[in-house]
A protein has these predicted regions:
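Flexible "arm" and connector segments at domain edges
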Residues: 1-74, 78-115
């Protein structure tokens, strides 16, 4: 699947020359640059979500543009989050495993268990 392939690619790029790959360049610049990108993309997702929500409220609105922007920005956020996880020697499988652990558990119960 795409997530598995992307995870493998991100691992390969960790050791690549920084002038050959955007991901390798991010890894070389380090965690602060990677986190800066995660923060930037988070903000862009928030703005795109707000724009999409506003567009949906307009009578007879065509929201295709705003929806596409939201999906695109979310993909950017996921991508940079995966780069962050890779840089920290983790990956999407760890997140999927955690989501699986939480599945079927009340959100309130799960939150209380973390305290």
């Amino acid at each position: 699947d795409v997530l598995t392939e992307l995870t493998a690619l991100l691992e390969q790029r960790k050791n690549a020359e920084s002038d050959t790959s955007y991901v390798a360049e991010l890894h070389k610049k380090g965690i602060n640059k990677i986190l800066e990108k995660v923060g930037e993309e988070s903000t862009e997702v928030i703005i795109a979500a707000k724009d999409f929500d506003i567009a949906r409220q307009s009578p007879n609105a065509n929201t295709d543009t705003e929806r596409k922007a939201l999906i695109s920005e979310t993909a950017d956020l996921w991508f940079h989050t995966l780069v962050m996880l890779s840089h920290l020697d983790s990956n999407a499988d760890d997140v999927i495993e955690e989501l699986g652990r939480r599945f079927g558990v009340s959100g309130l119960d799960e939150k209380a268990a973390r305290k």
